[in-house]
Amino acid sequence: MTKPLLEVSACYRSFQAGEQQLTVLKDINLSIARGEMVAIVGASGSGKSTLMNILGCLDKPSKGAYFIDGQDTSQMDVDELAKLRREHFGFIFQRYHLLGDLNAVGNVEVPAVYAGKDRLERRDRAESLLSRLGLGERLDHKPNQLSGGQQQRVSVARALMNGGDVILADEPTGALDSHSGEEMMRLLQELHREGHTIIIVTHDMHVAQHADRIIEIKDGVIISDEPNLASQTAVKAQVDMSLAKPSGATRVAAWDRYAEALKMALLAMSTHRLRTFLTMLGIIIGIASVVSVVALGEGSQREILKSISSMGTNTIDIRPGLGFGDRRSARVRTLTASDANALKNLPYVDSVTPSISSSVTVRLGNKAVTASVNGVGPEFFRVRGYELAQGQFWDDDSVDALAQDAVIDDNTRKQLFPDSTGAMGSVIGQVIFLGDLPVRIIGVTKPKESAFGNSDALNVWVPYTTVSGRMVGKKYLDGITVRLDESVPSNAAEQGIITLLKMRHGTQDFFTINTDTIRQNIEKTTATMTLLISAIAVISLVVGGIGVMNIMLVSVTERTREIGVRMAVGARQSDILRQFLIEAVLVCLCGGALGVALAYLIGVVFAQAGGSFQMIYSTTSIVAAFACSTLIGVLFGFLPARNAARLDPVEALARE
């Protein structure tokens, strides 16, 4: 005796309805041979559709066994059942269940995509099947552009796409007019003659009369199973239903499934443009905030460090006392020019400048202004980064000779010589009085901008020996500034300077100010502020991610029937998971791209508005923004995608 193709043994199917258990199928025993055309007839609620779902591997018996070509399906997992549906079964639904976003060819191709067929091969087969079914002129039409009969023929072509060894037709004429219904039945009989196993589920005995065997079911029990002698169709060939068909699990096939998921994600996004944009909005704002804050922090930090550099890079200032605010500092008189000379001999010191400061009245003719007179060494201007606009600086000979030469800043020039413009030839060589001391102007410095603002103070620089010997009459210094070699760590050099001066003074009666320490503190403060504000901006990203999850849950609910159709034609759980996960990630990636664009726009507006510094965008922050948006898509898209993948195909198909 020939082994049956499909065999159901002692099958029961029960459902939980509240606190009651409803048994829909009761002790079903049924076998269907390869190449048969069988009609299962019954009234609504008889259990015929439930039996069809079990036969088509959309459902499993609650009790009993179901064998396909001798293999027990009860031992198969969901993906193995999906493989059977994909490679051996084809479904024709009463409501067609076509995917509205795809055209006729696209709908027919879907089973082949999940089977891993080559793109050109599946396109040729889809077009060939549709042409054979009389839809050669409707290949690019979407379901809403086709009549009921045409949609049903697309459904038939889809069922045949991967071979359709077993065709399960659920009320195939239920939504068609009588003429289209007759055409459909003739088509099913033709497929039967070609060797396909046809199982028709119907409530209409007239439709059942087209089959070679009629099984009648009532209240979940088979009450009749008789051959239909009036319709015995000669079968021309047998369709091969070996369970060892190639699975299509190649790398190219996997990429094709990714491409299909990406295409469907783009279609879903374009169908609901406004909703998609509003979903992205939280991501856009969050990414723009993070990128802009990092750019602002980087820009402000660079500007501040530039200002610190303008005051002298890699320098250490030495002041009397134990710190700012030390009341005893005015009585400490131990810093001397010999200390400066000793420091100059250290191997890691580039240059040294002593300093003595005093505030005096500067007079020129009948003009008198209050200015800060700074007695410094010849290398002071190099240490502090001053540049000449006119004239020259003095040298060591001027220091030794207590020369009465002065360099003034641009503010002093404007106050004393308001009419000097251009080459300023009238300034160089002019004599001004510092108190009662006449000095000759030999140079004018260029204006010096700072992120802290341009000072209005008036500065006059003369040799420190001149201030000490001719103006204030003191032998000690107000401070010493040391410029370090660029290759030396400033902290180590600072300790060396402190050690030397402690040895010379016998105690530590001075303190140091390391500009590198200031720079490090500013960098730390800026980084902390950037992190704090970015953390606040991340909240927007989290809110945006919750919005993505919410909309994806809505999308899963809206597209439940689509998910059911895809499962019916053989989609694995991983295929459904991938499709919705890609959609969530794509929404977040697009939001990330728009967020980065918005951040750049903010930078342009900031520059046009006259910001005091430029926003500096880093590649790292942009890459991190995209990585963050992708991560949000994965994290917040996983739950909806998992829910979609875990849907029961029978329930999904029944959902309106």
UniProtKB/Swiss-Prot annotation:
A Gene Ontology cellular-component term: plasma membrane
EC number(s) stated in the UniProt entry for this protein: 7.6.2.-
Membrane topology of this protein: Multi-pass membrane protein
Name of this chain's protein: Macrolide export ATP-binding/permease protein MacB
Species per Swiss-Prot/TrEMBL record: Shewanella oneidensis (strain ATCC 700550 / JCM 31522 / CIP 106686 / LMG 19005 / NCIMB 14063 / MR-1)
Keyword flag Hydrolase: no
Cited Pfam families: ABC_tran, FtsX, MacB_PCD
Binding-site residues for ATP, renumbered to this chain: 42-49
Signal peptide start and end residues: none
Domain of life: Bacteria
Localization annotation: Cell inner membrane
InterPro entries xref list: AAA+_ATPase, ABC3_permease_C, ABC_transporter-like_ATP-bd, ABC_transporter-like_CS, MacB-like_ATP-bd, MacB_PCD, Macrolide_Exporter_MacB, P-loop_NTPase
GO process annotations (BP): response to antibiotic
Residue span(s) of domain ABC transporter: 6-244
Gene that this sequence comes from: macB
Keyword tags: Antibiotic resistance, ATP-binding, Cell inner membrane, Cell membrane, Membrane, Nucleotide-binding, Translocase, Transmembrane, Transmembrane helix, Transport
Keyword Metal-binding: no
Any one Gene Ontology molecular-function term assigned to this protein's record: transmembrane transporter activity
Membrane-crossing residue ranges in chain numbering: 277-297, 531-551, 586-606, 621-641
